[in-house]
Curated annotation (Swiss-Prot):
Protein name: Isoleucine--tRNA ligase
Domain characteristics, as noted in the entry: IleRS has two distinct active sites: one for aminoacylation and one for editing. The misactivated valine is translocated from the active site to the editing site, which sterically excludes the correctly activated isoleucine. The single editing site contains two valyl binding pockets, one specific for each substrate (Val-AMP or Val-tRNA(Ile)).
One GO process term, biological-process aspect: isoleucyl-tRNA aminoacylation
One Gene Ontology MF term: zinc ion binding
Pfam families, per the entry: Anticodon_1 (PF08264), tRNA-synt_1 (PF00133), zf-FPG_IleRS (PF06827)
Catalytic activity, as annotated: tRNA(Ile) + L-isoleucine + ATP = L-isoleucyl-tRNA(Ile) + AMP + diphosphate
Stated role: Catalyzes the attachment of isoleucine to tRNA(Ile). As IleRS can inadvertently accommodate and process structurally similar amino acids such as valine, to avoid such errors it has two additional distinct tRNA(Ile)-dependent editing activities. One activity is designated as 'pretransfer' editing and involves the hydrolysis of activated Val-AMP. The other activity is designated 'posttransfer' editing and involves deacylation of mischarged Val-tRNA(Ile).
SUPFAM superfamilies attached to this UniProt entry: Anticodon-binding domain of a subclass of class I aminoacyl-tRNA synthetases (SSF47323), Nucleotidylyl transferase (SSF52374), ValRS/IleRS/LeuRS editing domain (SSF50677)
Binding-site positions, L-isoleucyl-5'-AMP: E555
Length: 926
């Protein structure tokens, strides 16, 4: 007889192979056609809000692994909070203005900017941005990210631009906006100012020169002839703009004699300077403090008509150089700041393209970087060059064109951070920063930053809503003018600024304080960081489903100097507080060896490659498994490991589903007090897992959740509980309490597990959900997070089983050793004799009726340690001495039952059933 037909073997249509790359798009289509996002929001309507505000990615190019990591993290947070019962909408957004898009249009798409009007060029930029909004939108959706994709926010939308203008106006009305001549980062290739966050650093080879500035008037400090202050610089091109030499007031400076010349150098740097500047032998004549040398006048080394004043500054250090700092107020922030105290001219003899103007004298017409050679030669010719060498160092470069950038003083519009710096620092303290070091990082940045240069000399952006009186040149930024511009942008978009003249924009009758009524428009646009820094106002404060302030900002760690800061500054300036309560950062995605990904290195992995090869759920599981607050590694090896972990979780779910094929919860559910003890134990463990998982999600420790759930599925379920109950669920009568109890337990386990997995394995959890028996919500995304059932928590029971499982490990080792020694094949071929000490004997006695099932062997005898004899040991197949017991393995008595495969003394011949199986078949219909 074929006894297989009498067993309750698992059966399910749930596929063993996930086939995620082909299956996941079907789910996406299903969710979209069912309006799942709207249904989730409807269900949570009226509940407490939890708002994660999406930092806008830039609408340029396909998404990369950094985007994928960040977007999936956000999706995990939002889905978890929604399942917890919060109204947690997710409104994705895009940053759509700025230089990178202009650069793509002119450089990549070969558009001749000069052949078209501003409006025509802006139309091309608009279309380019919208093209990539759509491309990135589909790529984000493919990752399983749930959001209001039909209604994202865009910084180019008229409504957003209007709110941005109003925010600017409020800052202006509070006196925070001004125009000034200051050095700012300037890209000569893109011909515009840059924000600090738009600057990258790359290696560059630069000249390193030591130059002598001849003393013209020592103010009576020394009588020696031919005294020179030595400066060091790696930017010879800035020397034409030199106005001063800065010393530290407290440092010691030495007047030395070398040959026929005398030099002034910081005492602590003498040896280094003497060697590098090739001064040769020298003797110290006397020493001064920097303060004593203030006011000395030097001759400019290039121009006879110019002088260089010795001034004092606390920014001077002894880390490198000479302690005498070449100061060009038009080409350095610290130079500018210290020069203001001495009322020095801010000279910047370069045009927008980086070419020297007539103010540079003989160097007029030279590109600044090419002028290094000419200037060095001129210094040498005039006897001012002491030495020339070359160094490779980190140098600021434009984030878009990758060309070197310079500090250049130009007239720009600024936001005066000094006006609200202390309020910003206080607001930082009110935010919960994760990791905690983020607070000190952004504090230091805000404390030490200069004023914010908010103007850009481009056209693709939100225009600065400023007018100029044509009579007196005075700026017009009034509440009335701002309202007019904001309303115009709301109705027609910011293109209207470029299409209309000032009289068509301004209200009739508006006039300057001088009485004039004719105005012209500002031609600069706003910094794109002002765009994205306004999203809390233009999006969160405007959209009904959102709120202000929001609960969470979650972006890469580079945003401390970017979006976190620009958002904080605009919010504090206008509302006096931070726009976010909590700020969480993720690290960079690097390759398997921890190296930065780059096309030249050939180590780039794209999200599209992962979804096509493995599926989005594998990428999502990789995200969850990562300690994302640090840099996160990804490689084919890591992805294969993640796919293997996924397979084990999926197989656990499939095994359970296979054994619920005839289980209807409403009809077959066994009450908790009727469960077997092992069932109660595993459900107790489940409650602990739910508690720990909830805490891990709440604290954004997703990698802890990953390890917790993976360990529970693989070790506690697959390797223990589900393995142990196979005999019960396969061989016991279909309707028996014992079998239904196991099914009830498995059902409860999987129902809770799949809910905990839902924020991470968004596709697979939905697939499992559709196969789970019983009445349930149409989508798992409409369900609630599992809560701890205190009725199932039993700490004494948990400890009892924990102790047993420790001993079970020893039994498993003994069986494995016997298997390795070829003493047994299957563990069911074994009989185990346990000779235990008094304490262990008592503990095992309470399990005595189930030890065969728990050890998955055919027979077990529990004896006291003193009953063990050498004869027993010698006759055994194998024996192991462990703490508190000796484990003896013998061949099982009797023959194998053809139905349950257990050996039984009463089975003496082939095809003979054991007593249990005989009883089952006699009392069942099988």
């Amino acid at each position: 007889m074929n006894y297989k037909d009498t067993l309750n073997l698992p059966k399910t249509d749930f596929p063993m192979k996930a086939k995620l790359p082909s299956r996941e798009p079907e789910f996406l289509q299903e969710w979209e056609s069912n309006n799942l996002y709207q249904r989730v929001q409807q269900k949570r309507s009226g509940k407490p809000k939890y708002i994660l505000h999406d930092g806008p990615p830039y609408a340029n190019g396909n998404i990369h692994m950094g985007h994928a990591l960040n977007k999936v993290l956000k999706d995990i947070v939002v889905k978890f909070k929604t399942m917890q019962g919060y109204d947690s909408p997710y409104v994705p957004g895009w940053d759509t203005h700025g230089l990178p898009i202009e650069h793509q249009i002119t450089k990549t798409e070969k558009v001749d900017r000069k052949s078209m009007s501003d409006v025509e060029f802006r139309k091309k930029c608009h279309d380019y941005a919208m093209k990539y909004v759509e491309i990135q939108k589909e790529e984000f959706k493919r990752l399983g990210v749930r959001g209001d994709w039909d209604n994202p926010y865009l910084t180019l939308s008229p409504e957003f631009e209007a709110e941005q203008v109003k925010l600017f106006g409020e800052m202006a009305q509070k006196g925070y906006i001004y125009k000034g001549l200051k050095p700012v980062y300037w890209c000569t290739d893109c011909e515009t100012a840059l924000a600090e966050a738009e600057v990258e650093y790359h290696d560059k080879r630069s000249p390193s020169i030591y130059v002598g500035f001849h003393v013209k008037d020592s103010k009576g400090e020394f009588n020696e002839e031919g005294v020179e202050f030595i400066i060091w610089t790696t930017t010879p091109w800035t020397i034409p703009a030199n106005m001063a030499i800065a010393l530290h007031p407290e440092f010691q400076y030495s007047l030395i004699k070398s040959g026929e010349k005398h030099y002034i150098v910081a005492t602590d740097l003498l040896e280094t300077v003497a060697e590098e500047a090739k001064l040769g032998e020298y003797q110290i004549i006397r020493e001064y403090t920097g303060r004593e040398l203030e006011g000395i006048v030097c001759q400019h080394p290039l121009f006879d008509s110019r002088e260089s004043l010795v001034i004092l500054g606390d920014h001077v250090t002894l880390e490198q150089g000479t302690g005498c700092v070449h100061t060009a107020p038009g080409h350095g922030h610290e130079d500018y700041e210290v020069a203001q105290k001495y009322d020095l001219e801010v000279l910047s003899p370069l045009n927008d393209s980086g070419v020297f103007t007539e103010e540079a004298g003989q160097f007029q017409g030279l590109y600044y970087d090419k002028a290094n050679k000419e200037i060095t030669q001129a210094l040498d010719k005039r006897g001012a060059l002491l030495s020339l060498s070359f160094i490779t160092h980190q140098y600021p470069c434009c984030w878009r064109c990758k060309e070197s950038v310079i500090f250049r003083a130009t007239e720009q519009w600024f936001a005066s951070v000094d006006g609200f710096r202390q309020d910003a620092l206080k607001a930082i303290e009110d935010v919960d920063w994760i990791p905690a070091w983020g607070e000190e990082r952004i504090k230091a940045m805000v404390m030490n930053r200069g004023d914010w240069c908010i103007s850009r000399q481009r056209v693709w952006g939100v225009p600065l809503p400023i007018f100029y009186c044509q009579e007196c040149g005075h700026e017009l930024i009034t509440e009335e003018s701002i309202s007019a511009v904001a309303e115009l942008f709301r109705q027609e978009g910011s293109d209207a600024w470029f299409e209309k003249e000032a009289p068509e924009i301004l209200p009739q009758g508006i006039q300057c304080s001088c009485g004039a009524k004719k105005f012209s428009k500002e031609t600069d646009i706003m910094d794109v960081w002002f765009d994205s820094g306004s999203t809390h106002r233009g999006v969160c404060a405007q959209r009904q489903e959102l709120a202000w302030p929001v609960d969470l900002y979650l972006e890469g760690s580079d945003q401390y100097r970017g979006w976190f800061q620009s958002s904080l500054l605009t919010a504090v300036a206008t509302k006096g507080e931070s726009p976010y309560r909590e700020c969480l950062t993720n690290g960079w995605v690097v390759d398997g060896e921890g190296k930065k990904m780059s096309k030249s290195q050939g180590n780039v992995i794209a999200p599209q490659d992962i979804t096509n090869q493995y599926g989005a759920d594998i990428l999502r599981l990789w995200v969850a498994s990562s300690e994302f607050k640090q840099d996160v590694r990804v490689s084919q090896k890591i992805l294969k490991q993640t796919a293997e972990a996924y397979r084990k979780i999926r197989n656990t779910a499939r095994f359970i589903l296979g054994n619920l094929y005839d289980f209807t919860p409403e009809k077959d559910y066994v009450s908790f007090d009727q469960l077997e003890e092992i069932d109660s134990y595993i459900l107790c463990r489940l409650q602990k897992v739910i508690d720990q998982a909830t805490r891990a999600y709440d604290e954004f420790e997703f990698h802890e959740f990953y390890h917790l759930i993976h360990n529970f599925c693989v070790v506690e379920l697959s390797q223990f509980y589900l393995d142990v109950i196979k005999d019960r669920i396969y061989t016991m009568p279909t309707e028996s309490r014992e079998r239904r109890a196991a099914q009830t337990t498995m059902y409860y386990l999987l129902d809770s597990l799949v809910k905990m997995l839902a924020p991470v394995l968004t596709f697979t959890s939905e697939e499992i959900w559709q196969y789970l028996p019983g009445d349930r919500e149409e989508s798992i995304q409409l369900t609630d997070w599992p809560e701890v059932n205190e009725e199932l928590v039993d700490n004494e029971l948990e400890q009892k089983w924990a102790n047993f499982l420790e001993f079970r490990k020893e039994v498993a080792k003994a069986l494995e050793n016997a298997r390795k020694d070829k003493k047994i094949g299957s563990s069911l071929e074994s009989k185990i004799l346990i000779y235990a000490d008094e304490d262990l004997f008592k503990k095992l006695q309470s399990f005595e009726d189930n030890l065969e099932e728990l050890f998955i062997v055919s027979q077990v005898e529990l004896k006291k340690a003193e009953q063990l004899t050498e004869t027993v040991k010698n006759q055994a197949l194998s024996s192991e001495d462990v703490e508190q017991a000796s484990i003896i393995i013998e061949a099982a008595q009797g023959e194998k039952c053809p139905r349950c495969w257990n050996y039984h003394p009463e089975v003496t011949k082939a095809e003979e059933l054991c007593p249990r199986c005989s009883h089952v078949l006699e009392t069942s219909n099988k």
